[in-house]
């Protein structure tokens, strides 16, 4: 299974610890944590006990899109599963996700939405199962090659929601 779980961490240490514990309770998939900014220097220290976990900290604060692009460039894996630290596993999420890639999908996620055309594409409406316009990075698995071919995430995007919308549309258009 050629996958890595990637977490962008910015504060919320308790959420991060709970997230990592929930992942480890259900899978030994490698985890890579990206964090930046002086205030986050010690954020990952309590996670030293976990096996197969790599944390990277940078002194200069990066936005969400820039952080994800660095991860995509740094991680050596066919599939990258982006996760928000507020997400918790309640079972094996990796195996069924990877199975979807075998069906030809370039991205798979837990939550997605449809672009709201009525307000000139300024928002999305949540949708249940099925094809969506936008996947959200609470749990967003991507084929790394397809993600890079689509241009990755907007490096200027500070917040995940904005980056997710733009990236999802670019990936959908490129596929």
List each model region and its residues.
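Short aromatic/hydrophobic "clamp" motif used to bind/position activated sugar donors
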Residues: 80
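N-proximal low-complexity "stem/linker" segments adjacent to membrane-targeting elements
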Residues: 1-22
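A recurrent flexible, glycine/aromatic-enriched loop bordering the glycosyltransferase active site
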Residues: 123-145
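Conserved donor NDP-sugar-binding/catalytic core segment of glycosyltransferases
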Residues: 88-122
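Short beta-strand/loop segment that forms part of the nucleotide-sugar
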Residues: 28-38, 56-58
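Short, acidic, metal-binding catalytic loop of nucleotide-sugar glycosyltransferases
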Residues: 21-29
